[in-house]
UniProtKB/Swiss-Prot annotation:
This is Energy-coupling factor transporter ATP-binding protein EcfA1. It comes from Streptococcus mutans serotype c (strain ATCC 700610 / UA159). Belongs to the ABC transporter superfamily. Energy-coupling factor EcfA family. One of its GO terms (molecular function) is ATP hydrolysis activity. Its EC number is 7.-.-.-. ATP binds at G41, H42, N43, G44, S45, G46, K47, S48. Gene3D superfamilies: P-loop containing nucleotide triphosphate hydrolases (3.40.50.300). Residues 6-241 form the ABC transporter domain.
Length: 280
């Protein structure tokens, strides 16, 4: 069995056959089982198009997409979709149930899950995202963060191999974003799911195993978060903010402190500062 759960080989895509420049131009990359891959890049770089191709919502002009070793095609697209759950930027567009628990059960009913198992999955999913107390609420009456947690609960209840988050945290306040990212991390650890996250959020990127940078429909780079953050001011051109520790290090350099070019986590920066101060 291959360790690649997703693989794209020389994939090209156009929304319109008369489109001179393809939206995606001969891209190739893979995602490993259980990996958290963040995809970043400016609007129009091809991020959302890529994940919609993986889920079979769009069809590639050329190239191959393999999910768990199976080439995605018209014949198996529905089977492939059962392995993947997507959570979008605006959860209101995904709600169909009158209550939170009804909404989570909807996808399970369509899948033909027996009633007893369905109830167990709904309870488990709500507990996992800390929304059990809201099970009889109308989704429309929830806060933005609560809605996204319900959307994630619905995705998890389907027991997919892969969860795709298409800017799922972008409309939340900082506290709601951190809570949701923590929930995703907990789900990943508990179920060993593969996570693909389209994001501009530094906390999300930091938690990922690998970061794919997309630019003009192509793969600009693939690296660890630490390697990416070491690129300094280039991050602004990639649609990311400068990490807090990088800003502090830049200011300290200006007053005479010496640092190498390696990106430091907050704890590492704290230890480095204590070491420098103790030498004074």
């Amino acid at each position: 069995m291959t360790d690649k759960i997703i693989e794209l080989k020389n994939v090209t895509f156009r929304y319109d056959e008369n489109q001179e420049k393809p939206t995606l131009n001969n891209i190739s990359f893979h995602v490993k089982h259980g990996e958290w891959l963040s995809i970043i890049g400016h609007n129009g770089s091809g991020k959302s198009t890529t994940v919609r191709l993986i889920d079979g919502l769009l069809e590639a002009e050329s190239g191959q997409i393999l999910i768990e070793g199976h080439k995605l095609s018209e014949d198996n697209v529905w089977d492939i979709r059962h392995k993947i759950s997507m959570v979008f930027q605006n959860p209101d567009n995904q709600f169909v149930g009158a209550t939170v628990e009804d909404d989570i059960a909807f996808g399970l009913e369509n899948k033909g899950i027996p009633l007893k198992e369905m109830r167990e999955r709904v309870v488990e999913a709500l507990n996992l995202v800390d929304m059990s107390d809201f099970k009889t609420r109308e989704p429309a009456r929830l806060s933005g963060g609560q809605k996204q947690r319900v959307a994630i609960a619905g995705a998890v209840a389907m027991r997919p191999s892969i969860i795709i988050l298409d800017e799922a945290t972008s409309m939340l306040d900082p506290e709601g974003r951190l809570e949701l990212i923590g929930t995703i991390q907990k789900i990943r650890e508990q179920y060993g799911m593969t996570v693909i996250s389209i994001t501009h959020d530094l906390d999300e990127v930091t938690l990922s195993d690998r970061v794919l940078v997309m630019k003009n429909g192509q793969i600009e780079s693939s690296s660890s978060p630490r390697e990416l953050f070491s690129r300094g001011d280039e991050l602004l051109d990639l649609g990311l903010d400068i990490p807090f520790t990088s800003t502090i290090i830049k200011a300290l350099r200006q007053i005479g402190f010496t640092f190498d070019n390696r990106y430091l986590l907050e704890k590492e920066l704290e230890d480095k500062l204590w070491a420098l101060i103790s030498k004074k």
